[in-house]
From Swiss-Prot:
It comes from Legionella pneumophila (strain Lens). GO terms for biological process: tRNA thio-modification. This is tRNA-cytidine(32) 2-sulfurtransferase. Its cofactor is Mg(2+); [4Fe-4S] cluster. It is an enzyme of class 2 (transferase). Gene3D superfamilies: HUPs.
């Protein structure tokens, strides 16, 4: 911890440490690869994790990994200097995913999906080749609740970003230690620390992203009720399958079997779902 930490720094240390403890994100001997994109979130994550590492007595290792995707205007000189001053082990790897994205995605469409997929593959491969068993990402509380809202409104399912995830190849654990942290606190901390932020020129120019619309909607609701974002985060930890409609998680069809009655109940279906099917229609 800094010799004289600010109130927001103390807050970040508290909530990051709590998330790590709540979800058992980091254990003794872990080699944690922190994905440092050059944005405020990843700078904050790396800084706070490094302080927690020191506080733990170096019970785990951290390593900063930055992927240079060959975007026009990319300049990591200040980033390299900052990392050297902090004495944090790191590597900046260059892979031209920018050209692939520009070639595959039509002008005006969102690049994020393909860009993140290509980036994820490179990150997993690098972690495996270099012996890192944990991959730390800088998503914060507001990312989680916005993703939840986007999934409901645009995809028709209930999902978000889990605090801890087993990768698809079953070789890594992905962790999000900032999952309890509010974005406004990250903004304040980034300003205090004067991080050498590298803007994303690819995504930043696309103002029509759904995520920005959803963020604006949540912000508007929070004006009327400031607890809206925290309530949404709590909802991710408080699912009640019996109050939803997913038949994979709750046996609605055979609830009669749970009735406490002396009468014998025959649970024969009156209707068959196939009788009411319509082509190409979704409720």
């Amino acid at each position: 911890m800094s010799s004289n930490p600010s109130s927001v720094e103390k807050k970040l240390l508290h909530y990051t440490g709590k998330a790590i403890a709540d979800f058992n994100m980091i254990q003794r001997g872990d080699k944690v690869m922190v994905c440092l994109s050059g944005g405020k979130d990843s700078f904050t994550l790396l800084t706070i994790l490094n302080q927690l590492r020191i506080k733990s007595g170096n019970k785990f290792e951290i390593f900063a990994f930055t992927l240079d995707q060959a975007q026009p205007g990319w300049n990591d000189a200040c980033l390299r200097q900052w990392l050297a001053e902090k004495s944090i082990p790191h590597e900046i790897l260059t892979r031209d995913t920018y050209s692939i994205v520009k070639e595959k995605i039509p002008e005006g469409k969102t690049y994020c999906s393909l860009c993140s997929r290509l980036r994820r593959g490179i990150i997993y491969r690098y972690a495996e080749e270099n012996g890192f068993n944990k991959i730390a990402l800088g998503h914060h509380r507001d990312d989680l609740v916005r993703t939840l809202m986007m999934s409901i409104l645009y995809n028709g399912d209930i999902r978000s970003m889990p605090p801890k995830l087993l990768s698809d190849n079953k070789k890594h654990i992905v962790i999000r230690p900032l999952c309890y942290v509010q974005e406004k606190d990250i903004i304040t901390f980034a300003s205090e620390q004067a991080f050498p932020i590298i803007p994303c020129n690819l995504c930043g120019s696309q103002e029509n992203l759904m995520r920005k619309k959803v963020a604006s909607l949540i912000d508007q609701l929070a004006i009327e009720n400031p607890k809206v974002p925290s309530n949404m985060l709590h909802a991710l930890q408080s699912l009640k399958p019996s109050q939803l409609m997913d038949q994979n998680f709750w046996n609605f069809k055979n609830l009669e079997d749970g009735l406490e009655t002396t009468q014998s109940i025959q649970c024969e279906e009156v209707f068959n779902a196939q009788e009411f099917e319509l082509e190409d229609e979704k409720i």
